[in-house]
Amino acid sequence: MSIHSVECNVGTNPITIETGKMARLADGAVVVRSGDTVVLVTVVSATKVKEGQTFFPLSVEYKEKAAAAGMFPGGYFKREGRPTEKEILTCRMTDRPLRPMFPKGYFYDTQVITLLLSADGENEPDILSINGASAACVVSDLPFAEPVGAVRVGRIDGQFVINPTNSQREHSQLDLVFAGTKDQVIMIEGSANELPEEDFIAALRVAQENVKVICEKQEELRAVCGKEKRAYELCLAKPELLEIGYEIAGDRIEEAIYAPSKVERQKKVGALRDEVEAAIKERHPEATDFDVEQVFEYIQKKAFRISIMEKDKRADGRALKQLRPLTAEVNVLPPVVHGSAMFARGETMSLCLATLAPMEERQYMDNYTGSVNEKRFILHYNFPPFSVGDTGRFGGQNRREIGHGALAERSIAPVVPGEQEFPYAIRVSSEIMESNGSTSMASVCAGTMSLLAAGVPLKRPVAGISVGLVTEQNDQHEITSYKTLLDIIGSEDFYGDMDFKLCGTSEGVTGYQLDL
């Protein structure tokens, strides 16, 4: 048994990454430790693509074991049960930086699993999970572009602290999770207590410097014990079908994708897609629906990016920095509802309902890692299928809904009055009425208004906005030019290079989430 390890000297406690001791039948496996917090992270990828597979089936699972904290699980059966909200948020946080590192068209079933084996109550395992997932992929035989590192940044007494302990976080003005490669940000997430813009930017720079150290250590580990990369095939648009697609749609795609309303745009695009499908299947009867979809998506994305970069032209006709029309209304429901508000930005609309209750109604949570175990301010986000004019599953929350709710909650939380000033439990329910991009930011705006309507003495109103990015790159994948978009719609999120959600008050930043 050959065991190899590296130590990353960043933050309050060094991070140790070890491989070769546990889970040796996985494609990649590492044990990551900081203080007495230990996680095992594994990755396994199938060697064949399932028939009919049309996307990259990456699943990321994170599980906290009660034994890790020397505790018994609650409940009658004394076993760990369904994922907690914290586990789901850690899954999302681990997933998002990994996904861009796999090649486009890699459709092999891939699973990353993180198990919390030991929790010391001070060092949070979420950062270890992200670093471990990257390291497991790096030492495996999977096609993984380059290492990803992650750190948490706090700001205590005016000084930035890398990977603060839970005790330190109680006194921090900032809670920033930053994941990236040696020279590029991939994901940021967190909250702040109305942090000034210049301090927020400085925190990002400090985070990038420390992430670089972690990435270099992962490269050292790969050089010593990394496996030879496997052979694989990519599912990409076929050139002969792409040629037919351009014959039919090349001169007409721009007219189809540019319309003031989402419904009109979908109708035009759908009709043109049907023409492309008919032409392709007439000449190539063996072509599948997925082949057609890849061709049309390629053409559509190319047209979108050319129009932004060369013409400054957006799908709904706005200028690059122009907001959609805003509408807002409070007390939209009878007074039996404590506070209600509706906020719409173009075709995105949130209806928020605020409820006050005695402190006994606060939420209590099982906690094995020493972080927050109760909340008196809760925001729940619900995304029914009718909000996009569709049918589908109704009831219960998926990971996306939990993630969006958490973003809106932590963005408003810094302005909620303390328990001594306002001794009530507070719940906001955001019901998405219409969706065409940035529903979480609409939830922040509507949620703030509903709280004010309910009589909650917020320090200041909070607002949120989304920012997009479209880039051009050279053969070395270096950005040569770019355009930023303000208040992005759904297609700009899908075809663009970035979705950056930023919330704050007139005094500073309160919440944020960025994905590339």
Q: How would you describe each model-predicted region?
A:
Residues I3-H4, C8-N13, D27, V38, ...:
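Alpha/propeptide regions of enzymes that mature by internal proteolysis
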Residues M1-A46, K50, T54, E233-V372:
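Extended amphipathic alpha-helical scaffolds
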Residues A133, G403-I412, Y424-A453, L458-V467:
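Extended, hydrophobic alpha-helical segments in both membrane/secreted and soluble proteins
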Residues D27-T110, L116-N123, K182, E189, ...:
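Glycine-rich, flexible beta-strand/loop modules in the N-terminal catalytic cores of phosphate-handling
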Residues G28-V30, V38, N123-D141, E329-A354, ...:
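Conserved phosphate/anionic-ligand binding catalytic regions in large, soluble enzymes, centered on
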Residues D141-P260, L451-L516:
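Mobile "lid/hinge" segments at catalytic clefts and subdomain interfaces of large enzymes
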Residues K104-T110, A145-P147, I214-Y232, V263-E264, ...:
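Flexible, glycine/charged-enriched surface loops at secondary-structure junctions
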